[in-house]
Amino acid sequence: MGKKRRISNKLLLVGAIFTIAIPSVSYAEEVISPENFKSSSNLYEGRNTTVLKTSLYPDTYNYPFNQQFISKLKEANTTIKKVDKRDDENPIISTTLSFIRHMNSEDYKSAFDLTSRSLQKIISKEWLKSYWEGLPVQLQAGSFIEIGEVTQKETNPVHTNVEIQLVFEKMTVPLLIKLDPSGKIDDFQLSMSFSPVAERPSYSKPESFVDKEVVVGSGAFPLPGTLSVPKENGPFPAVILVQGSGATDQDETAFALKPFRDLAEGLASKGIAVLRYNKRTYEHGLKTQFSPFYTVDKETTDDALLVTQFLKNEPLINKNQIYILGHSQGGMMLPKMIEKDQNKNIAGAIVMGGPARTIQDVVLDQFEYLFSIGAMNLDQYKFYKSQFELLNDPNFSGQNPPKDFYLGSAVFWDSIRKIKAAEMSKEQKTPLLIIQGERDYQVQSKIEIPLWKEQLKERDNVDYQLYPKLNHFFTEGDGEISKPDEYYSPANIPEYVINDIAAWVQGKSQLN
């Protein structure tokens, strides 16, 4: 197997995404060590860092945080429902089973024939072979044994999602396969599915709002979403929810947490319409992976602005009261959205756990904390520190990166490395609400909030709200600073956060 195909396997270990770590960093999808970066960095030039998947930490699976998740995958081996021998009459399930069976029997042509025309433009039979052979190696899972439970999950106007459990010697791994309306496989990625997940929050009042299935955009990257609209008489102010980095669904599902579902249902229960959507890197992971010269604007900014224009045409929405809430990297990109909002569609913006500084500076502080609690060793910390120093060099070029730059697409990094959200917001006029959990170890309030306040001290339309008990995903916990494994515990965003956001939006709406 050639080196390039081995690297491609690593690019495809797509799972849940850790907002504000390395851009498009996964929780537990990559196992690329610094040594592997160095031996293969030239293969990444011009690639899409959105699915490059440089690991949350190098050698991700070795950390206690992710070992806890892996141990849960291993436990699933004893309880999985075997269906490989079953003849399933459901054509969606049948196609999914056939796809895996063909690859396991090394019939990659038949597997390839089950994929959509759009996917066939970017992958090949040889690529499928490389992916399948490399999967257990990258996961350190041992030999493939059999297919486990197959579940038809979400169906939206763009894709029908099927989760299939792949039973290996050492663990059972969920693979999320997306089929287009014609029944062809259009995308697939590892799924960091987790059980149990947080239940619907008590403050959600489903009887008070209606969920409307929508599709934003067309062409290669249509994005399915949900518009939650109050049942009262409109028009209503609306909030658009923009995720952090990586491949996240419309609920911004992070292990046991669903923060965007909580926000959407909570705000809709209080008379505010909310639109949330699957991120491009989640709905079209493989296509974005192979898109040349992928930038942070393509990952985050442009789709968010497309959604604002979409809402302008919704009859139940107050066209002058469209707000954007950006979480984590989404919050960091809000000033860029405001800058590019030529039609002045954005009435106000809510920065939810968004950094004031460059992402590489924020991540370095995050890694220092992880090193201090034993979640990262010294060599790994030094490796990333050296990489971030290259990004901070004014002469860094995405088109001609240093030979010792190993973090993936230099084009993507060049598009994001200079963004300083607080500084960009200094001269802008759009009202801001900046909310921050004080226990957040990923975007640390003791560093970021003073910088926001210093840069915006001359502005009179910026409000701040700090929450002593909340972490990066705005759920409560104990201790001065949160730890990564906190995200495994099902929890909801507290109602007091919903109340604060609703009061701010409704207050601004009444002024106009």
Where are these regions (language model features)?
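Short solvent-exposed beta->alpha transition segments
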Residues: 84, 94, 109-157
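N-terminal cap/lid segment of alpha/beta-hydrolase-fold proteins
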Residues: 195-233
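Cap/lid segment of the alpha/beta-hydrolase catalytic domain
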Residues: 242-272, 276-298, 370-371, 476-486
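Short alpha-helix in the alpha/beta-hydrolase fold that links the catalytic acid
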Residues: 444-455
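Catalytic active-site module of serine/aspartate enzymes centered on a nucleophile-bearing elbow/loop
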Residues: 473, 479-512
